[in-house]
Every structure is written in C-alpha cells, then in structure tokens.
Amino acid sequence: MLRTMLTAKIHRATVTQADLHYVGSVTIDADLLEAADLLPGEQVTIVDINNGARLETYAIAGPAGSGVIGINGAAARLVQPGDLVIIIAYGMMDDAEARRHVPRVLFVDAENRIIGRGHDPAEALPDDPSSLRGDLAVPGNPVTAAARRGTPTHQAPVALPASRTVVAPR
C-alpha cells in the first residue's frame, strides 16, 4: 500500500502577483523551491488563508531572491496579490518510508523570506503568540480557549488524552 504524505509546506507566503492570462502554475522564488525541496513541475496544493480557496497546480521557478509567489492562469480568479497562502506538496511512499519520513516546513515573512525551518507540520509560527499548534486546537483544550481569548499560546504542551497521542517521527 502507498500512503500520500506531506513532503513540504511553505507557510503563510504572501502572493505577490496574479496573472489570469499566463498559462497555469504557481511561480515560486527559486530559493524557496530549493529550501522546500520542491522541483519545477511538481504538483502543489495552494490554500488561500484569506478566502479558503484550495487548488492544485504545479510549481515553476521564479527569480532567486525575488520573493515572488505568483498565481498564474485560471487560479488568479481565486487568489489575489496580498493574500496569504500555504503551499503544500505531497508524495506517495510505502508504509515503511512513510513512517520514517520527515517533511520540510518553511515559515516566511511578508516579503517571503525564510524566517524559520522545521519538520513539524503542526508547529506554530515562530515568535507569534497568536498562532496555535495544529495538534492543540481541539475543543476543551485550555490552550485553544486561551488562543480564542487572545492570550499568548506559546506554553508547555497540554497533555493529550491517549486517543490523541502524537508520535514524533523517528
């Protein structure tokens, strides 16, 4: 059996351009592609944080160091310049590889410069007390309640019930 696993995530990138008349794809700064281990032509999912749109396309390399995140073709009707997006890539692997696999997670600033690197897909934004770990966002969790009240959430993880145990990659 093959499993589809997260291989890379560029978190909260800012869309710098959208061109309806360009032939498909998403243009991504070549430095970001390399740091995320994405190849030109690789399938990616784009999730627009501003409006909830979700689409699939393929990556093409933009000029290195430019910070470009360009939405091209029909997707430009769904995602606009200035929108925050998450760019996600998945890969298929057998069970043994999937259990060992560690994804690449990049955090970028408003100019799409890398401000953090990691391997934990649930990790909160670095130095952002308003962001919440994805695995702690469960009903009844005091950290979730604190986040909704605007209280800083970067604190020791709350013990999860056995049914919610998270196992770190080896």
Curated annotation (Swiss-Prot):
One of its GO terms (molecular function) is aspartate 1-decarboxylase activity. It is an enzyme of class 4 (lyase). The active site is at 25 (schiff-base intermediate with substrate), 58 (proton donor). Its EC number is 4.1.1.11. Is synthesized initially as an inactive proenzyme, which is activated by self-cleavage at a specific serine bond to produce a beta-subunit with a hydroxyl group at its C-terminus and an alpha-subunit with a pyruvoyl group at its N-terminus. GO terms for cellular component: cytosol. Residues 118-170 are annotated as: Disordered. The modification Pyruvic acid (Ser) is found at residue 25. GO terms for biological process: alanine biosynthetic process; pantothenate biosynthetic process. It catalyses: L-aspartate + H(+) = beta-alanine + CO2. Pathway: Cofactor biosynthesis; (R)-pantothenate biosynthesis; beta-alanine from L-aspartate: step 1/1. Substrate binds at residues 57, 73-75. InterPro entries: Asp_de-COase-like_dom_sf (IPR009010), Asp_decarbox (IPR003190). Heterooctamer of four alpha and four beta subunits. This is Aspartate 1-decarboxylase. It comes from Frankia alni (strain DSM 45986 / CECT 9034 / ACN14a).
